[in-house]
UniProtKB/Swiss-Prot annotation:
PANTHER family: CHOLINE MONOOXYGENASE, CHLOROPLASTIC. This is Choline monooxygenase, chloroplastic. Its EC number is 1.14.15.7. It comes from the Eukaryota. Residues 96-203 form the Rieske domain. Its cofactor is [2Fe-2S] cluster; Fe cation; Mg(2+). Pathway: Amine and polyamine biosynthesis; betaine biosynthesis via choline pathway; betaine aldehyde from choline (monooxygenase route): step 1/1. One of its GO terms (cellular component) is chloroplast stroma. Binds 1 [2Fe-2S] cluster. Binds 1 Fe cation. One of its GO terms (molecular function) is 2 iron, 2 sulfur cluster binding. Catalyzes the first step of the osmoprotectant glycine betaine synthesis. Belongs to the choline monooxygenase family. The keyword Iron-sulfur applies.
C-alpha cells in the first residue's frame, strides 16, 4: 500500500504540509508596494518586470488550498516569457545550487565552468588548496573568461590578455599604462559564495560576503540547502564515497518545471510510461516524505533480476528532489544526479551525472548495460515532457488537478509560490 509521510515543512504551506517557521530567507530586498509602483527593478538590474502582470500570474495559484481541493498552477507559469525572466531572479539566484562535484576540483589548479540562468561561473581550487567561485566575466570588457574544465595556473582573457590569479585577483592588465584612477586591486573577478557538501559543489549567485569569498561550513550548507532531510540522505548513502563514471545531457523542448513535475508525481506515471523500470520496482511500497525544501520518494526493488544476475536497481531506490532544480537518485550500487537548467520558457537542459560503487567501476559490461537502461527511461521522459509542453500551449488547457500521490509536486509548487509572491 502506498504511504505518505510528512516531516518538517515551512509555515506558509497549507495545513496538510504545515510546520516550522523561519526556514526561508525573507527576501525583503524584493519588497514592493504594488499600489504605489507599476514597475520595479529586481535582482538583475538590466531586467524590468511589470509588477501587476507578474503578481496576477503568481496569485492564480493558492498554496493555502490543500492538495485535495487545489488546482495546479496555470499554464502561463510554463509559457510566459516575462514570468520566466522574473522566475530566474526570484527562484534561482537566492539559494544554494548544486553545480558540480568535488572530484572536478580535486587537485590544486583544477577548475570547471558552467551557466545557471544567465549567470556564467567558474569554480577553481587555488595553489593553496582553497576553493573559489567567480562570475566568469572579465572585468575589462565583459568577455567570458574561461571555458570547459581542466587545470590552469591562471585565467587569461582571450580578448585582450588580462590575467587573473586563481584567487580572483587581477595580476596583469595589458596596455593600461597612462590610464588614470585605475588599480589592479579594484578590478578582480566578482566572487560567488561556494560550498561543498559530500560530493557536491554548490553556489549562491548572491554576492560573497568578502572580496575573496569563503567556503561555507558543512553545517551551514546542510541547514540552508537540505534542512532536516540531511540525516535521511546520509542514511541513504548520498554522501558515501562513490566513483564518478560519466555525464549525459538531454536538451528538452519544455519548461524546466515540466521536467520537475514529472519527477515529482509520486511514481504515478511509472506503470504507464516506464514498463521496463516498473518491473524492477515494487510500487506497493512507494512512500513519500516531505521536508522543508526537499522531498524524498522511496520504493522497494521488484523481481527484475536477469538470468545473468544483472540488477542495477538493487533492493530499494531513493529519489530526492532538492528545490528548486536538483534530483539525487540512489539505487543499488548507483547514484545519479539530475541538474535541470532553464534555457528559456519552453526549453531546458538536464545534466545527468553517474556515480558507482568503487568495487564496480571497472566492470565495463555492467556500466554499459546500466547506462543503456537509464537512457531508455530518460528518453521516455523526454517524450512525456515535450508532449506536456505542447499541451500547455493549447487554448484548451489552463489548470489541472492533483492526485493524492502527487504531494511532492504540490509541495514544489508551494515553494515556487513562496519565492515568487510580491
Amino acid at each position: 500500500m502506498m504511504t505518505t509521510l510528512t516531516a518538517t515543512v515551512p509555515e506558509f504551506l497549507p495545513p496538510s504540509l504545515k510546520s516550522t517557521r523561519g526556514y526561508f530567507n525573507s527576501h525583503s530586498e524584493f519588497g514592493v508596494s504594488i499600489s504605489k509602483f507599476s514597475r520595479r527593478r529586481f535582482h538583475n538590474p538590466t531586467r524590468v518586470f511589470a509588477v501587476s502582470d507578474i503578481s496576477k500570474l503568481v496569485t492564480e495559484f493558492d498554496p493555502k488550498i490543500p492538495l485535495e481541493r487545489a488546482s495546479t498552477p496555470p499554464s502561463s507559469w510554463y509559457t510566459d516569457p516575462q514570468f520566466y525572466s522574473f522566475e530566474l531572479d526570484r527562484v534561482f539566484y537566492g539559494g544554494w545550487q548544486a553545480v558540480g562535484y568535488s572530484d572536478q576540483i580535486k587537485e590544486s589548479r583544477d577548475f570547471f565552468t558552467g551557466r545557471l540562468g544567465d549567470v556564467d561561473f567558474v569554480v577553481c581550487r587555488d595553489e593553496n588548496g582553497k576553493i573559489h567561485a567567480f562570475h566568469n566575466v572579465c572585468s575589462h570588457h565583459a568577455s567570458i573568461l574561461a571555458s570547459g574544465n581542466g587545470r590552469k595556473s591562471c585565467f587569461v582573457c582571450l580578448y585582450h590578455g588580462w590575467t587573473y590569479s586563481l584567487s580572483g585577483s587581477l595580476v596583469k592588465a595589458t596596455r593600461m599604462s597612462g590610464i588614470q584612477n585605475f588599480s589592479l586591486s579594484e578590478m578582480g573577478l566578482k566572487p560567488l559564495r561556494v560550498a561543498v557538501w559530500g560530493p557536491f559543489v554548490l553556489l549562491k549567485v548572491t554576492a560573497a560576503t568578502s572580496r575573496k569569498g569563503e567556503v561555507e561550513t558543512d553545517e551551514l550548507v546542510a541547514s540552508e540547502w537540505l534542512g532536516t532531510s540531511v540525516g535521511r540522505l546520509s542514511q541513504g548513502g548520498v554522501d558515501s564515497p562513490l566513483s564518478y563514471i560519466c555525464r549525459r545531457e538531454y536538451t528538452i523542448d519544455c519548461n524546466w518545471k515540466v521536467f520537475c513535475d514529472n519527477y515529482l508525481d509520486g511514481g504515478y506515471h511509472v506503470p504507464y510510461a516506464h514498463k521496463g523500470l516498473m518491473s524492477g520496482l515494487d510500487l506497493e511500497t512507494y512512500s513519500t516524505t516531505i521536508f522543508e525544501k526537499v522531498s524524498i520518494q522511496e520504493c522497494g526493488g521488484g523481481s527484475k533480476v536477469g538470468e545473468d544476475g544483472f540488477d542495477r536497481l538493487g533492493s530499494e531506490a531513493l529519489y530526492a528532489f532538492v528545490y528548486p532544480n536538483f534530483m539525487i537518485n540512489r539505487y543499488g550500487p548507483w547514484m545519479d544526479t539530475n541538474l535541470v537548467l532553464p534555457l528559456g520558457p519552453r526549453k531546458c537542459k538536464v545534466v545527468f551525472d553517474y556515480f558507482l560503487d568503487p568495487s564496480l567501476k571497472d566492470d565495463e559490461a555492467f556500466i554499459k548495460r546500466s547506462l543503456e537502461e537509464s537512457d531508455r527511461v530518460q528518453m521516455e521522459d523526454v517524450m512525456l515532457c515535450e508532449s506536456v509542453q505542447r499541451g500547455l500551449e493549447s487554448q484548451a488547457y489552463d489548470k489541472g488537478r492533483y492526485a493524492l500521490v502527487e504531494k511532492p509536486m504540490h509541495h514544489f509548487h508551494c515553494l515556487l509560490h513562496h519565492n515568487l509572491k510580491l
